[in-house]
Amino acid sequence: MTGPQQGKILLRLENVSREFITGEQTVRVLNNINLTLHSGEMVAIVGTSGSGKSTLMNILGCLDKPSAGEYWVAGRIPQYLGSDALAELRREHFGFIFQRYHLLNDLSARENVEIPAIYAGIDREERRKRAVNLLSRIGLAERLDYRPSQLSGGQQQRVSIARALMNGGDVILADEPTGALDTHSGNEVLNILKDLHQQGHTVVIVTHDMSIAEHAQRIIELKDGEIIADRPRDHAQEKPKMVDIPSVIDIPSMDEKISTGAQQETEIARKPLLTRWKVQYDRLHEAFKMAILAMAAQRLRTALTMLGIIIGIASVVSVVALGKGSQQQVLANINAMGTSTLEIFPGKDFGDMRSAAIHTLRDTDADVLAQQGYIHSVTPTVSTSVTLRYGNKSVSGTVNGVGEQYFLVRGYTIAQGMAFTRTSVNDLMQEAVIDENTRDKLFPNGETPLGKVILLGSLPCRVIGVAAKKQSGFGSDENLNVWIPYTTAMKRMLGQSYLKSITVRVNDDIDLANAEQGVIKLLSQRHGTQDFFVMNTDSIRQTIQATTSTMTLLVSMIAVISLIVGGIGVMNIMLVSVTERTKEIGVRMAVGARASDIMQQFLIEAVLVCLLGGSLGVALSLGIGLLFSLFSSNFSMVYSAASIITAFVCSSLIGVIFGFFPAKRAAEMDPIRALERE
C-alpha cells in the first residue's frame, strides 16, 4: 500500500517479515509488510502494544534487519551492508527521537546535540555553532549548558529533536515522541515535527494514540504485525504557531546524499592528511572526555580499580630502583678495593689451613711484577693489630705495611699532608699515614696530626699524612687504620721476611683475565709451583652483578603478578561499566557511531585508568625512595628514565590487553537490545 506521492520514492519494503527466537519458539513480529514512503511525507505508524510498530521503525532506521523480504533506502539494500555502512546510513540520513529522550546525563544539552556530528567528522567549531543554532531556534538558547537532569521533559525532547537534526535528519523517526510529556509539551513537540515536515524533512511518527496520528498526512495502522490500513489525510492540519524553524541546515535530498554515500570513504581518504588527522584527533578528544566523565562519575570504584595498578607499578619501579641502587653500591664497594686489581694470597684459597705455613710471597715478587708491561702498579702488604697511642689517648687499630704505590692502587685520596715515598720504603722510615677515623680518635679537638709522633705498639712513627675516608662494604667503615712502609713493618714490628699479600693494579687497556693468567704463570715459575691464589675483583664484580640482576628479576616477576591482578580488576570493572552504560552505547550507535568508535571509547577509558594508576604508582615509588633516602645515608634507590617509561608502557599495555574484551563486547552490542535495556 502507498500513500500520496509527495516526492521520489525514499524508503520501500517488500514482503518484509521479522522473526525473533524465544527459547524454542519463533515469534513473527512483522508479517509480509509492503510499504513505500516518499520524500517529504509526514507519516504516522499507529498500533497497540505488540503490533510491531517499533520493530518496523527499527528496520526503517537501519537499527534492525528483516528476517525475510527486502528493504530499500533510496535504492540501497541495508540488510546486505556491513555494520560500518549501516552506521553511515544512520549517521547521515536518519534522526531518531525517542520516547524517553535517551540523552547522556553527563553531557550538557549542547554536547548531547553535538554527538552525531562527532561521528560524522565535523569540525569542533562548526558542530558547536550548528548545535547552538539548532537549540536556539527551538527555544533553548538559555539552556545550552544545562544537563538533562536540569531540564523538563519537554525541554529534553527538544534537545532530542535538535540531536536528530544535527547531521541533516533527512528522515526523522519519532518513537512515541509525546508519550512521556504533558499535553502542552506534547503539542509543542508535534508543532516542531510538523514545521520540520514543511521544510522538507520526511517525518515518521510511531504512536499508539490515534489523536497523535491525526497530525500526520498519512496514517498506517498495524495489528499483529500486519498493515490493516494505510490512508492519507485529505485535510491539512492548521499551520503550527508555536515555533518557526527556518531551514537551519542546508539539506540536500536524501537521494542525492545516498547516491554519493558509497564514495564517502574514498573522499575521506583523499582529504589532506592534516584534515584526516584533525578528524581523528577530534574523535579521540571526545573519547578522552567521555572516559574522564565516566571515571569521575564513579570515583570510588575508579580508585579501587586503579589500586591494583598503583601497587603493581610502584612495586616494579621500586624493585628495579632497589636493584639498581644495590648494584651501584656493590660496585662502589668493589671499586673501594681498587679498580682492575688482582689480590695475590698464599695457599690454595681462603680458609686453607696450610696458608699460614707458606712464606713464599716476597717483596722481590712484587718488584718483578712491577716490571711487567701490563701492570700499572704493585704494592706488597703485611698487617697486624696493635694499640695506637698519642699522649693519654690509646685505641686499638690495624697497622698496614704497604708500598709507596698502595694509595694509587687502592684509589685513596690524601686529605692532609702526603704519602710516603720509595725512599721511605727503602730506608725503613718510621713514617705513618693515618685515616680520618684514627685522626678523630687520637686528635679529637681538631689538633693537626701532621708531624706528631704516635706509638704503634712500641714503635714510634711520625704522622706525615691523613687519608680521606673511603666507603667499603667489605669491613666496617669505623675501623682505625694506619699505613707505614712495608719494610718498616716487616723489620721493625713483625720481624718477618715474607708478605701477607700482594696487590696488583693492571693497566686499563688490558683484559684482567689475561693479566691474571700472566701473573699466575710468572709467579709459578718463580716459586716452582702454584702455592698461591689470585682474587680477581672483576670476577667478583660480575658475580655480584649477575646475582643482583637475578634477584631483581625474581622480585620483579612477583611484582608483575600484582600488575596482572590489577589488570584483571580493570577488565572486571570495565565489564561492569559496559553493562551499566548499555543504553548509552545504543544511543551512540543509533546516531551513527561505528563499532570501532565504541571500541575506541572503552579502550581509551581502560588505558586512561591504567595510565593514571601507573602515574600514581610511579609517584608512590618516588615517594618511597625519598623516605628511604631520609633513613639511609649510605644507600639510595636509583631511578632511571628507562624504568619509568617502561612502567608507563606496561600501564598502557595492561589497559589495551585487559580492556580489549570489554571494549569488544561493547562494540558488538545490538543497538536495539542496548536501547531497550533499562
Curated annotation (Swiss-Prot):
<dbReference type="GO" id="GO:0022857">
    <property type="term" value="F:transmembrane transporter activity"/>
</dbReference>
<dbReference type="InterPro" id="IPR003593">
    <property type="entry name" value="AAA+_ATPase"/>
</dbReference>
<dbReference type="InterPro" id="IPR027417">
    <property type="entry name" value="P-loop_NTPase"/>
</dbReference>
<comment type="similarity">
    <text>Belongs to the ABC transporter superfamily. Macrolide exporter (TC 3.A.1.122) family.</text>
</comment>
<dbReference type="InterPro" id="IPR025857">
    <property type="entry name" value="MacB_PCD"/>
</dbReference>
<keyword id="KW-0472">Membrane</keyword>
<dbReference type="InterPro" id="IPR050250">
    <property type="entry name" value="Macrolide_Exporter_MacB"/>
</dbReference>
<comment type="subunit">
    <text>Homodimer. Part of the tripartite efflux system MacAB-TolC, which is composed of an inner membrane transporter, MacB, a periplasmic membrane fusion protein, MacA, and an outer membrane component, TolC. The complex forms a large protein conduit and can translocate molecules across both the inner and outer membranes. Interacts with MacA.</text>
</comment>
<keyword id="KW-0813">Transport</keyword>
<feature type="binding site">
    <location>
        <begin position="47"/>
        <end position="54"/>
    </location>
    <ligand>
        <name>ATP</name>
    </ligand>
</feature>
<keyword id="KW-1278">Translocase</keyword>
<dbReference type="GO" id="GO:0046677">
    <property type="term" value="P:response to antibiotic"/>
</dbReference>
<dbReference type="InterPro" id="IPR017871">
    <property type="entry name" value="ABC_transporter-like_CS"/>
</dbReference>
<keyword id="KW-0046">Antibiotic resistance</keyword>
<feature type="transmembrane region" description="Helical">
    <location>
        <begin position="641"/>
        <end position="661"/>
    </location>
</feature>
<feature type="transmembrane region" description="Helical">
    <location>
        <begin position="608"/>
        <end position="628"/>
    </location>
</feature>
<feature type="transmembrane region" description="Helical">
    <location>
        <begin position="558"/>
        <end position="578"/>
    </location>
</feature>
<comment type="function">
    <text>Part of the tripartite efflux system MacAB-TolC. MacB is a non-canonical ABC transporter that contains transmembrane domains (TMD), which form a pore in the inner membrane, and an ATP-binding domain (NBD), which is responsible for energy generation. Confers resistance against macrolides.</text>
</comment>
<keyword id="KW-1133">Transmembrane helix</keyword>
<keyword id="KW-0997">Cell inner membrane</keyword>
<dbReference type="GO" id="GO:0005524">
    <property type="term" value="F:ATP binding"/>
</dbReference>
<keyword id="KW-0067">ATP-binding</keyword>
<dbReference type="InterPro" id="IPR017911">
    <property type="entry name" value="MacB-like_ATP-bd"/>
</dbReference>
<keyword id="KW-1003">Cell membrane</keyword>
<keyword id="KW-0547">Nucleotide-binding</keyword>
<feature type="domain" description="ABC transporter">
    <location>
        <begin position="11"/>
        <end position="249"/>
    </location>
</feature>
<dbReference type="Pfam" id="PF00005">
    <property type="entry name" value="ABC_tran"/>
</dbReference>
<protein>
    <recommendedName>
        <fullName>Macrolide export ATP-binding/permease protein MacB 2</fullName>
        <ecNumber>7.6.2.-</ecNumber>
    </recommendedName>
</protein>
<feature type="transmembrane region" description="Helical">
    <location>
        <begin position="303"/>
        <end position="323"/>
    </location>
</feature>
<dbReference type="Pfam" id="PF02687">
    <property type="entry name" value="FtsX"/>
</dbReference>
<dbReference type="GO" id="GO:0005886">
    <property type="term" value="C:plasma membrane"/>
</dbReference>
<dbReference type="InterPro" id="IPR003838">
    <property type="entry name" value="ABC3_permease_C"/>
</dbReference>
<keyword id="KW-0812">Transmembrane</keyword>
<dbReference type="InterPro" id="IPR003439">
    <property type="entry name" value="ABC_transporter-like_ATP-bd"/>
</dbReference>
<dbReference type="Pfam" id="PF12704">
    <property type="entry name" value="MacB_PCD"/>
</dbReference>
<dbReference type="GO" id="GO:0016887">
    <property type="term" value="F:ATP hydrolysis activity"/>
</dbReference>
